[in-house]
């Protein structure tokens, strides 16, 4: 959600930043709606004042001079706003009581219209993406993203390596055929040491973030109310991509970002409560998964996958620093696993709907010979906090402010499995277990 007043008061800057995403974006509809709202408010206030003044003229205590003034005000108001129902030009109690009833109906219609326009403004703002920060690079899409840094040496196998899905099926740790029989295309079934590898990554990520990085671990429900999805900007724009449960109007979460952030929905925090750092594991459910060719194979894009999510709530002045901290925590997982990666700063045209600034971590996949996103770390500023009404008091008695929210994957487990299978496979089609996972796995090789 946006600060409507800030946008209208800083229209040039807001438009310039919005156009970082798409040159076709414009705030002209908002300007028109705001103009209509102001007119409705002004007319409604004038109608109420006229109604009150004329009503007082019916009192026995009203002087002739007061009634003359009431007639004058009524005639002027009707001429400006109710030309089809002109006010009597001379005071007659019966005639003015009849005209007052018409004025009440007109005033009520104005109130109704004001509510409609306010709803239209809210609906419009709900569908406008967050404004990119001024430092976000210009660009139209993925090709315009900027590489910030790399870590590790990308592996190049000297043998005919297998892609992760073929290797997983050969080692009997992934079974896509059984998953399809159960749920259809776009699902994965883990077997034996494959299931243990998933569980080991979950435990390693959570242990690292809670023990080393200071996050509070939470385990939230995986089903949430509609207002939670609105709060973290999945709705209304992406409703068709969500799994909805009828007749309760509940949703399977597409990421633990939704449930963790909304722990604080409609809450008033104190400055001493900030920053909040939470991590949590969850399955993630997304209807939009699946595509032709390699993109639709194996674990690349599925309807259900597991992930450990990192969420921060912070004071506005700290969010830029904490964004860098968040990225470093996700990087630490890849470094511990020995997986080469690069950090990409997303351009305006590639930003997610709610992000004001985002860094993607892309892991190297030697068999596919490409970099693949494994974590997105975003700063939302107060965009989500306004939608979810999450505020804090900078000091006792001070005016409340909206917090800033940030989140990132730490990491997506399915894609981490995919990377491990591609990077750590051997010429005899086995998989070396990364050293940090061996105490969880109980084996060195799969």
Describe every region a protein language model picked out:
Residues 1-154:
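N-terminal alpha-helical targeting/anchoring segments
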Residues 39, 148-446:
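TRNA-recognition modules of translation machinery and tRNA-sensing kinases, especially anticodon-binding
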